[in-house]
């Protein structure tokens, strides 16, 4: 009897330890980001049913439990049109260095869940050696992803390699699924004027462009200027998306208040040490969300009025800061 009781006690202890080691994941902050993206999508598509929603990174939101083997979260996946992913094959640890195989495999399992639901995957690899740029394009193509080999992490540059660009074509692109390549150019600092920026982009044949609503002088691109940017050099048309960070506040944006440095709102958190001027936010806070969408003065409404085809949402992985 004593042996039986001892065995029973050990069994209970083992299960108790397992419960402590493997608690159910706290999905609060992931779910709050999902809700934020879904609400942004419903608002935008309510104004323009063809408006395209592409969240970047934070691909764990593709499943209900955030696990790479989890069940697809179709409520979220159906609210978006694609996913952006940085550093998939190159740049995860260092630029121009291959991403570790285990990290690549993990991300691909999640990206494929979104892809298999009908979404388009846009990959940005940070790679500058021509041979590695070729490898990036090939590996992404083999995986069924559309990709851009960025030779500057600041995304302030149109790469001179390869020439012609990967998968160049003269088609008119009206849906994200038609895009065979894209240009990620959100930092206009090297360009002397809007005209200089527009001329540089329209001299290319990329199927899609990700850019900023604002030029470096703080002025917005007009609907007429966005319409110009939709022209490829070869006569085709491209899609144009506006970058918008929803998981961090940026102190150079129009919404930034001068007194926030000494009297910050409750939802404004610590500075991002990797990107000075960027601050973590409680992205579920109604005051922050009101800045982003839902009213005529919001950031997203400005993007819609400028004639962009969609929005490229960044810092989706902002939930990691709070977990």
Predicted regions and their residues:
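Positively charged n-region of N-terminal signal peptides that target proteins for export
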Residues: 1-4
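Glycan-processing catalytic domains of CAZymes
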Residues: 21-323
């Amino acid at each position: 009897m004593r042996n039986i009781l001892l065995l029973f006690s050990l069994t209970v202890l083992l299960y108790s330890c397992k419960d402590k080691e493997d608690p159910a994941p706290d999905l609060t902050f992931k779910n709050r980001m999902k809700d934020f993206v879904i609400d942004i999508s419903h608002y935008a598509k309510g104004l323009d049913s063809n408006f395209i929603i592409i969240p970047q990174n934070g691909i764990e939101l593709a499943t209900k439990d955030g696990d790479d083997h989890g069940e697809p979260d179709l409520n979220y996946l159906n609210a978006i049109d694609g996913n952006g992913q940085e550093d998939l094959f190159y740049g995860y640890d260092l630029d121009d260095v291959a991403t570790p195989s285990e990290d690549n495999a993990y991300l691909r399992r999640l990206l494929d869940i979104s892809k298999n639901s009908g979404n388009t995957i846009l990959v940005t690899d940070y790679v500058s050696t021509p041979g590695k740029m070729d490898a990036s394009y090939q590996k992404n193509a083999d995986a069924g992803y559309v990709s851009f080999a960025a030779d500057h992490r600041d995304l302030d540059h149109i790469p001179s390699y390869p020439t012609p660009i990967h998968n160049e074509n003269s088609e008119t692109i009206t849906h994200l699924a038609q895009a065979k390549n894209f240009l990620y150019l959100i930092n206009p600092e090297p360009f002397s004027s809007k005209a200089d920026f527009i001329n540089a982009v329209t001299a290319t044949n990329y199927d899609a462009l990700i850019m900023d609503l604002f030029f470096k002088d703080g002025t917005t691109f007009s609907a007429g200027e966005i319409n110009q940017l939709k022209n490829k050099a070869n006569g085709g048309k491209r899609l144009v998306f506006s970058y918008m960070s929803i998981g961090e506040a940026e102190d150079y944006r129009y919404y930034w208040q001068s007194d926030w440095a000494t009297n910050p709102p409750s939802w404004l958190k610590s500075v991002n040490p990797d990107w000075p001027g960027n601050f973590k936010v409680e992205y579920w806070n109604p005051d922050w969300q009101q800045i982003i969408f839902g009213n005529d003065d919001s950031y997203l409404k400005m993007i819609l009025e400028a004639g962009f085809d969609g929005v490229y949402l960044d810092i989706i992985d902002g939930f990691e800061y709070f977990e």
